[in-house]
Amino acid sequence: MKKKVALHNLGCKVNSYELEAMQQLLEQAGYEIVPFEPGADVYVINTCTVTNIADRKSRQMLHKAKKMNPDAVVVATGCYVQTDEGKLETDEAVDLVLGNNQKKNIVEVLAEFEKEHQRQAHIIKINQTKEYEELEISRTAEHVRAYIKVQDGCNQFCTYCIIPYARGRVRSREKENILNEVHKLAKAGYKEVVLTGIHLSSYGVDFPEDKKETLLSLIQAVNEVEGIQRIRLGSLEPGIVTEEFAKELSSMPKVCPHFHLSLQSGCDTTLERMNRRYRSAEYKARCELLRKYFGNPALTTDVIVGFPMETEEDFQASYDFVKDIHFYETHIFKYSRRHGTKAAAMSGQLTEAEKAVRSDKMLELHQKRAAEYETSLLGKTLEVLLEEEVEIDGKAYYLGHSREYVKVAVLKTEEYGVNDIPAVKVEKTLQPHILQGEEIQVL
């Protein structure tokens, strides 16, 4: 009888990719994949440590798994595992601990546990490794859009961030391996790929001179893959957006006009304390370059509120800057004090109440700007990748995303279906953050 394994992911798209790769390795080894419910023989939890809340959720899911089946093997892997300083190795809810850069060994580690029945920890010194852990997927849970991990690690060491300690230094994936995966996904019917990594803008910086690659050269190569109609990019550092970069991207019709430029704060004083490598004027110039070459792209970002020593004036400067840029989406994070980072030792730590007030104010601005951007698309013809069938107000629709990553619904007909990309004239707002359009033609 096949062993049953249930998997659960916490955290970013890189984590999601790695969990899907582990799932496919387990399937190939003869395991049956089942929902994360009671009855599994093995539970694999891919943990996250980006905030204190992520740490707590990681611990909760591990304990939940053991409660669902006390006889099951519970495997903890991912970023929380890498940074918890061995605490999980003594946690009775956890049988196996698998650090980052060890996920490819999931099948062998489980087989070894079956023989020994002894709790084990497989963790390397992540900051010393130069090896990129080669994982691959042949399909994804999304069915129409595939996230592809091209890079791991980060060399930036922003003062608030624990991730370099969890992921190690920059390690880039060989371009040939990336392209092989893209070709396989294209043959499997995927029309959109999203290039993602821990610090995507650093792709290729660790390669030797004789095989130098950059993120731009990688995108150019992916652009040549037949069958792929859309290329989307994960989070970018502002510094990568030069005139050449923006111009070259705009010359590739597959590249979507949707860019996530990490900001964190619009206040120069705070940016300096954060050890960010740019200031607000430079960031604004990068946004203007993207608008110069893409017209009305969807610009999205991350902002931290309540960073140590952030005064009311500092917050207001950040708020005013975000307001001025007109982002489509702003992901707002209340500063989370991460043990081992420089910011954790800074004076001037703000209360949770102060952070909440600032977060709420920034969230109101985000909601207003999101609605404004969606309104700017009314009357336009957008290409929409249809992803699922939904029912809204008693009517059947296909729901998908435009190239700008805005949700658009079209009435269900026999002329097209999931994974088609019709040209849609957007007519109105159907629901908050869902536009409605009328199909013109299937591309």
Predicted feature locations:
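Conserved strand-turn element in the central/C-terminal portion of the radical SAM core barrel
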Residues: C161-G168, R230-G239, S265-R276, L290, ...
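Proteins enriched for Cys/Gly/acidic motifs involved in redox and nucleic-acid/cofactor modification
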Residues: M1-G204, T214, E244, L249, ...
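Conserved, mostly hydrophobic/aromatic
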Residues: C158, I178, L195, L233, ...
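Residues at or immediately flanking beta-strands
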Residues: K4, E192, R230-R232, H258-H260, ...
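Short, electropositive alpha-helical surface patch
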Residues: P208-Q220, E243-P257, E310-Y328, E352-V357, ...
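Flexible glycine-/small-residue-rich
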Residues: N9, G197, S235, L263-S265, ...
